[in-house]
């Protein structure tokens, strides 16, 4: 049986589901950029890419060298093809306008170029997260300047989302709104090959991921829920749970898509003005789209994440996503 490459899969989607050719091209360009990022990550100290830049991004986070390198790879790969009207990145203060010398396209690309970059120096998994939106008609004119408002669309408006994870293998996990597929990079071929055809999250689980060092800062509903998880079979949930934490959302979510589980990053009391740590546009929305398409659920503790109307490019949210049964339980505790 012949292997199905990402290119073949996307062409077949164009034939069977009328996936637009420009969207197909965009996904292929993002995938090529992810291969380049994977190559840079794999070089590590040999490529002189470890360590920090000595600068901070708009979030106030210290930028690693690979954060900046990955951001530039994605910008340069996508700016010239004529399929995008603009881009936005966790590493940039403002939206990126496609240079005037290139044609503008119908889509917007939003990305976290290197999620989990604190793992780089310890050789643990990192990844790239991306989301594709349609550009509002009023910004499609070649002469119309793009601004932040064009990107402020709820997650339900995403036409595609995915991530690449750079671990023992490099994988690209993708949804076009019709289920979730996983592609593994065959380095000899230089192509992503379909290896996970129908990724589905079990409804129930006995595994959760949360940073327990923040426990003292959590709100009461989170304290209650996590204490019940830790109580195991002697507690109200009547079963034992294992805890996992990789400190990279892309790695924790990949595990959940592979075998089920619950990922939590609750809001806490340290910065009451901020509703969470993770970014809605770059992290929560694309991951929520993937998780829902795989049969899971995703909320901020009160409402479905994909229904949130963004108010800013770098807006933060609390996140509970994964196996539906546990997401619904955690959300119910917030509403009690």
UniProtKB/Swiss-Prot annotation:
Residues involved in substrate binding? 115-118, 211, 277
The EC code for this enzyme is: 3.1.3.11
Broadest EC class assigned to this enzyme: hydrolase
SUPFAM superfamilies linked to this entry: Carbohydrate phosphatase (SSF56655)
Keywords associated with the record: Carbohydrate metabolism, Cytoplasm, Hydrolase, Magnesium, Metal-binding
**Binding residues for Mg(2+) 1:** 90, 112, 114
Q: Which reaction does it catalyse?
A: beta-D-fructose 1,6-bisphosphate + H2O = beta-D-fructose 6-phosphate + phosphate
| Annotated Mg(2+) 2 binding sites | 112, 115, 283
The record describes how the cofactor is bound as: Binds 2 magnesium ions per subunit.
Q: Where in the cell is it found?
A: Cytoplasm
Q: Which InterPro entries match?
A: FBPase_C_dom, FBPase_class-1, FBPase_N, FBPtase
Its required cofactor(s), as named, are:
Mg(2+)
Q: How does it assemble?
A: Homotetramer.
- Which family would the database say this protein is a member of? Belongs to the FBPase class 1 family.
Q: Which PANTHER family match?
A: FRUCTOSE-1,6-BISPHOSPHATASE-RELATED, SEDOHEPTULOSE-1,7-BISPHOSPHATASE, CHLOROPLASTIC
The protein, known as: Fructose-1,6-bisphosphatase class 1
Write the lineage as a comma-separated list.
Answer: Bacteria, Pseudomonadati, Pseudomonadota, Gammaproteobacteria, Pseudomonadales
């Amino acid at each position: 049986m012949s292997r199905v490459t990402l290119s073949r899969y996307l062409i077949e989607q164009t034939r069977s589901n009328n996936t637009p050719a420009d969207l197909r091209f965009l996904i292929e360009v993002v995938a090529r950029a992810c291969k380049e990022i994977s190559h840079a990550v794999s070089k590590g100290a040999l490529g002189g890419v470890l360590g920090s830049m000595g600068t901070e991004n708009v979030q106030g986070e210290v930028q690693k060298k690979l954060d900046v390198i990955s951001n530039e790879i994605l910008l340069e790969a996508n700016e010239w093809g004529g399929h995008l009207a603009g881009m936005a990145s966790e590493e940039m203060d403002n939206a990126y306008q496609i240079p005037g010398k290139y044609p503008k396209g119908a889509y917007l690309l939003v990305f976290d170029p290197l999620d989990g970059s604190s793992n780089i120096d310890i050789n643990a998994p990192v990844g790239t997260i991306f989301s594709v939106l349609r550009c509002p008609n009023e910004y499609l004119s070649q002469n119309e300047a793009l601004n932040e408002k064009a990107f402020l669309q709820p997650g339900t408006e995403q036409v595609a989302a995915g991530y690449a994870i750079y671990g023992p293998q490099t994988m690209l996990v993708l949804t076009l709104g019709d289920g979730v597929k996983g592609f593994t990079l065959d380095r000899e071929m230089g192509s992503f090959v379909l290896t996970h055809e129908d990724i589905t999250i079990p409804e129930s689980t006995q595994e959760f991921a949360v940073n327990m060092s923040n426990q003292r800062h959590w709100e009461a509903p989170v304290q209650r829920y996590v204490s019940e998880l830790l109580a195991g079979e002697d507690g109200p949930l009547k079963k034992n749970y294992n805890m996992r934490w990789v400190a990279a959302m892309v790695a924790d979510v990949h595990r959940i898509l592979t075998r089920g589980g619950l990922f939590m990053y609750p809001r806490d009391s340290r910065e009451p003005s901020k509703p969470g740590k993770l970014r809605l546009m770059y992290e929560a929305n694309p991951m929520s789209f993937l998780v829902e398409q795989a049969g899971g659920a995703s909320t901020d503790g009160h409402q479905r994440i994909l229904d949130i109307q963004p108010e800013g490019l770098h807006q933060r949210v609390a996140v509970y996503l994964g196996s539906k049964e546990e997401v619904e339980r955690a959300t119910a505790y917030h509403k009690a």
